[in-house]
Design a protein with these regions (language model features):
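Serine-hydrolase catalytic core recognition
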Residues: 4, 9-307
Length: 307
């Protein structure tokens, strides 16, 4: 159903979509390096505090950003894009991260293996382990913050958001690492759902994509190897509300990936919704603000009453 904002919004029925032209383009924006350590991180917004901590000496760092002088607040764990990716400027006032903070959410940002700017070894550690180390690092960072910072984080209201590659990771976490419902709701934004067919849902050379995720160029071997890192394999385990958002003109991951996720979950009577909006694989679309508001509204409706 198309609404007044120009969004195609799911209405509890299966969605049928025709694939026309598969293509792929990568989104780049301005990025900023962040000094890491057990200390406050500098920022120019006096209403916001951000700090980072090393987790158990493993090399994993988590960044926490929130409004100053607030009581315990709900949190959104951010799965960054990539898979190999620099850190965005989380305090860029036009960013989705800044929007979340201003809406009263704390951000928990695991600088998982694959994030650049920490060291070459850390940056390359994810290669050959997509869908494995990124999931492990996200869970480890989340549990660390929930355990050590429950004085400022409302641990009963922790949510999960990921865009692009991060959208793929959150879908995997939904089925493989959320049996305890640590995440009360999840948003996958332009993510991959079925890794087995993803090589043909992007403009990249299929053999290169198969090599990256399955270390093979044989279709049958690839399909078998990626089963354990494909969100589709674990859809029956989804146990919290999930919102899929996808841009109709996305050329990195075909919109049909999110449509398939929604349809499969719907058949299993999962609590799932789908929102499709015009635009390519970037946050910078005409309806950016409306999309951000939709995500926040979704998380707000999923909050548990902790009074």
């Amino acid at each position: 159903v198309k609404d007044g904002n120009g969004f195609w919004r799911s209405c509890g029925k299966e969605v049928v979509l025709e694939q026309k032209v598969p293509c792929r383009v990568f989104y780049k924006k301005s990025w900023a390096d962040v000094e890491l350590g057990r200390k406050l991180l500098p920022n120019q917004d006096e209403e916001i505090v951000q700090f980072s901590e090393n987790i158990n000496g493993s090399g994993l760092v988590v960044v926490v950003i929130m409004k100053k002088n607030t009581a315990t607040c709900p949190a959104i764990v951010i799965c960054l894009g990539g898979p190999i990716a620099p850190m965005p400027d989380f305090l860029d006032q036009s960013s989705i991260y800044y929007h979340f903070i201003k809406q009263g959410f704390a951000l928990i940002i695991p600088l998982r293996r694959g994030v650049s700017g920490i060291g070459k070894e850390w940056e390359r550690a994810l290669e050959g382990h997509y869908g494995e180390y990124d999931v492990e690092d996200t869970i480890a960072a989340t549990d660390f913050v929930m355990l050590h910072h429950s004085d400022v984080i409302d641990t009963k209201n922790v949510f999960l958001y990921g865009g692009s590659y991060g959208g793929y990771v959150v879908g995997l976490i939904a089925g493989k690492a959320n049996s305890n419902k640590r995440f009360k709701a999840i948003v996958s934004h332009c993510g991959v759902y079925d890794i087995a067919i993803y090589p043909w849902h992007c403009q990249g050379i299929p053999e290169e994509t198969m090599k990256a995720y399955g270390n093979t160029t044989d279709k049958s071997v690839y399909s078998e190897r990626v089963k354990d890192i494909s969100p589709k394999t674990f859809v029956s385990n989804w146990n919290v509300p999930i919102l899929f958002i996808h841009h109709l003109n996305d050329t990195t991951t075909w919109v049909g990936q999110s449509v398939a996720a929604y349809n499969d979950a719907l058949k299993l009577r999962k609590d799932v919704a789908l929102l499709i909006v015009h635009g390519p694989h970037t946050y910078d679309i005409p309806q950016k603000k409306s999309v951000f508001l939709e995500i926040v509204a979704f998380f707000e409706t999923c909050k548990l009453n902790t009074i």
